[in-house]
Amino acid sequence: MYNSVGIVKSHESDGESSLDIEFHDVAVHHALHLANKDNLSLAALSPKVLALASTSQGGKLIVNYFSSGDVNKEWTVEMMEGEAVTGVAAGDNWVAVTTSTSHLRIFSAGGIQREVIMTPASLVSLVGAGERLMVAWQGSQQELSYSLYRVRLTGLVPLTSSPQPLPLSPDSELYWLGFSDSLTACSADTGGWVRALDSRTGLWHPVINTRDHTRGRSDFHYIVR
């Protein structure tokens, strides 16, 4: 996993698994090296939270909360029997997970579960930044939909009245979903188009076609947030 905060890398050596977490700004936190005994394969990283999860049934969500400098608060939650984590996201003071039982669970950065809601369809992407959380779903007829939320200490505040269509270029797939530095929701597809959501109108506006700025067929742009 790579974003504007840092990198989470998984290593396999001599039958042992480990995780290395590096921060672009060492003032945020020093690098971490963790044994991966729980087969953690999902990660989300914000300036205040590192969230790791396993995708096995009854798997774990493990969170490091960088509450005060190098003083970490670590907590763990085990999913219910038959429930597996399918996605994880983190913001300033919260962690969100989607699960195989169609649950969206919201936790405070300190480990308190604030809310659980049912999700309408199969998860495609789960992203967070600041107080914003966006979820993309696989809808009917292979169309994608999204829901946008503000995450408060008391729970979720919907910013869309219901799941809304997520536009894509013809014959393309969703390539990236995330937020700009100003917390504007953005998307990119394999057709090369990057779009930004106007939260006032609910309309997606084209920002750039990255294919206009590549020289060869194998060139591509990697979006970082």
What are these regions (language model features)?
Residues 67-70, 109-111, 151-154, 200:
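Short loop/turn segments that connect beta-strands within beta-propeller blades
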